[in-house]
C-alpha cells in the first residue's frame, strides 16, 4: 500500500487520503508507512473514526486508566455511547475504484482458500444478510447462538472485519428491539473491549495478556507435531473438535462456540502454544 496509494493519488490528483483509523499493531505499522510515503508528495493521511462502536481508548475508568475486566468496561461503554450512522449514501461522494485507474500494476489474485465460501462480499450482501438475521434470527439469538447444530448466529463477523457494514448500523437497528437484541449488543461490546485491550497492550497479540498462563504446559517434538496436524485436519478423535475443524476446512467458516472449543482443546488438552 505504501507504493500503490501514492501512485493512485498521483494519477487522480488527490490532495488528501481519508481512512478509518486502525488500532492493531499491524494496522498502525501499515498506516505509518503509507503516511510517510504520502508525506513526500505533500498529501496528508487523515484517520477518522474507527470500525468500532466506541473507539479504543475512549472507555476508561474515572482515573483514565484502561479496563482489564469486561463487565465494568461494558457498563461504562454503554454510558459513553456512540453516534448514529451517518446520513449518507452511494451518491454522497464520487467513488473511485482503483481497478479502473490507468497505469497501475494489475491487482494480485487472492490466494485460493480451496473451499467454496458461502459468504458473498460487499455492502449490499452485508445489508441483506443483516436484514435476514433481524427478521429470522434475532428473536432466538440469545439461546440459539450456543447451538452449533442450528444456524443461530448472524454470520456478520467477516462483514465487520472487512468494513462492508459498520457496527453503528447494527446497533441502530437493534435499538428498541426485544429478544436477542441485548445479547447481540453485548457481543459488539466484546469486540470493542478486545480492540481496546490490543490498543492498550499491543504485546497481547503475541504473548499471554494474563501472565498466569505463562506457566501452562507446552509439548514439543514429533508427538506435538503429529497432534497439531491431527487437530488441523479434524482427526483428533474428539467429535465436536473434529466437526468444527472439518467445517472450517470445508466451508471457510466455524461456529463461534466451536471456535472456543477447538482453541481451548489445542492449548489445554494438546498442550500446544496458541
Give residue spans per PLM region.
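Secondary-structure transition/capping motifs at alpha-helix termini
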Residues: 40, 177-178, 204, 251-254, ...
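Trp/Phe/Arg-rich N-terminal binding region typifying the photolyase-homology
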Residues: 1-82, 180, 246
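C-terminal substrate/ligand-recognition segments
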Residues: 195, 229-272
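Helix-loop-helix junctions that connect adjacent transmembrane helices in secondary transporters/permeases
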Residues: 203-240
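Alpha-helical packing segments of well-folded alpha/beta enzyme cores
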Residues: 1, 126-133, 170, 240, ...
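An acidic- and aromatic-residue-enriched active-site/binding cleft used to recognize and process polar
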Residues: 22-23, 50-51, 164-165, 190-193, ...
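A general alpha-helix detector
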Residues: 17, 155-156, 169-173, 243-244, ...
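Glycine/tryptophan-enriched, flexible segments
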Residues: 64-215
